[in-house]
Amino acid sequence: MIIGIGIDIIELNRIEKMLDGKLKFMERILTKNERNVAMELKGSRLTEFVAGRFAAKEAYSKAVGTGIGKEVSFLDIEVKNDERGKPILITSTEYVVHLSISHSKEFAVAQVVLESSSR
């Protein structure tokens, strides 16, 4: 059974401005593992990576129904890729989490569907 659905879209140029020499932004948004991946990226690929993670975390918080804040922080949520490159959202939840991230020239978008773990 579907418990929640969340979607978020972010302008890449907004993230690009936040990344401009501001390691603090990445420390606030990305987990240590995500920052390790980000440090290997440059230019537009870095912007897309961070924007995708930002959108995924926002979409998850909307699917849960709390938004980012006291109950769920950016650092409570980690996005990894499986062996085929599919993004996987990792968090301490009892739900099955389905995540999709996409990018265009100007935007990154993510959608999260939460499903109850008992089928």
Swiss-Prot record:
HAMAP family: AcpS (MF_00101)
Signal peptide: none
Main location class: cytoplasm
Identification of the protein by name: Holo-[acyl-carrier-protein] synthase
GO process annotations (BP): fatty acid biosynthetic process; lysine biosynthetic process via aminoadipic acid
Catalytic reactions on record: apo-[ACP] + CoA = holo-[ACP] + adenosine 3',5'-bisphosphate + H(+)
NCBIfam families given in the database record: acpS, pantethn_trn
InterPro entries to which the protein is assigned, alphabetical: 4-PPantetheinyl_Trfase_dom (IPR008278), 4-PPantetheinyl_Trfase_dom_sf (IPR037143), ACPS (IPR002582), P-Pant_transferase_sf (IPR050559), Ppantetheine-prot_Trfase_dom (IPR004568)
Gene that encodes it: acpS
Location of this chain's protein in the cell: Cytoplasm
One Gene Ontology cellular component annotation held by this UniProt entry: cytosol
Gene3D superfamilies hit by this protein: 4'-phosphopantetheinyl transferase domain (3.90.470.20)
Annotated binding of Mg(2+), by residue: 8, 58
Family: Belongs to the P-Pant transferase superfamily. AcpS family.
Keyword Lipid biosynthesis: yes
Keywords: Cytoplasm, Fatty acid biosynthesis, Fatty acid metabolism, Lipid biosynthesis, Lipid metabolism, Magnesium, Metal-binding, Transferase
Enzyme Commission code(s) on record: 2.7.8.7
Primary role: Transfers the 4'-phosphopantetheine moiety from coenzyme A to a Ser of acyl-carrier-protein.
Pfam families cross-referenced by the UniProt entry: ACPS
Cofactor field: Mg(2+)
GO MF terms, alphabetically ordered: holo-[acyl-carrier-protein] synthase activity; magnesium ion binding
Presence of the UniProt keyword Mitochondrion in the record: no
Broad EC category: transferase
